[in-house]
């Protein structure tokens, strides 16, 4: 007879609780597979995330421009970051100007894709127009052309504008005339579904020109007659308006690309033609 001390104790397997995360769950699944990963953002959320990010980036650069204007005052202490000229959006090759050019180039590329995929030349026409605006600003074509006109024609000062400013206006007018003809042809040949896109881009580009040309020349005319703070405010208004409408252009083109396809409406049948 075996004594109690010599008996083998039966070992009962111990199952860890599912909350411990070390053993199988009651339904036999792997506990690591029971933890659901967060779902991806739906397409609408992704679009709004990208748009909000771009708008916040615009606001941050405009805020940097505003800080620069205060830090750049003669009696203000120099700021180690924002006193640099690149923060002034009124200067060429500034941070704001570079961001604006990037956005216009992105809009141009997307318009070319729309032209190819939808077989609508009106998108290609708008790509040409926006590219021309970008190249003109990037290579300073209107400034160089204005200087050539001043040298060749001896342009006078008119209505508070310097001869150079008048020459730039003439170059802009010539560019607008040529591009306007191209736009009219593109609009006349545009499919019906692209009509709204045409007028939306026309409005946005018109506002961009209003700030880039109109407010710019107004600044030149009134600056000698207003306090420095008013001149600074006009410069900031021009910079803000240009950047905002460049951003709206790229957002509008992106919306044209992602919107659902509109169903074609069939012509209503005349009651007299209904089969009986």
Please name every model-derived segment.
Residues 142-152, 217-238:
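Interfacial helix-loop-helix junctions of multi-pass membrane proteins
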Residues 57-78:
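Alpha-helical transmembrane segments of multi-pass membrane proteins
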Residues 100-111, 173-182, 240-257:
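Hydrophobic cores of alpha-helical transmembrane segments in multi-pass inner/ER membrane proteins
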Residues 113-123, 187-199:
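Membrane-interface helix-boundary motifs at transmembrane edges
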Residues 211-221, 225, 237-274:
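C-terminal transmembrane-bundle signature of multipass membrane proteins
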Residues 84-99, 154-170, 229-243:
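Short aromatic-rich membrane-water interface segments that cap or initiate transmembrane helices
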Residues 57, 126-133, 192-220:
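Alpha-helical transmembrane segments of multi-pass integral membrane proteins
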Residues 135-182:
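Membrane-proximal helix-loop-helix units in multi-pass membrane proteins
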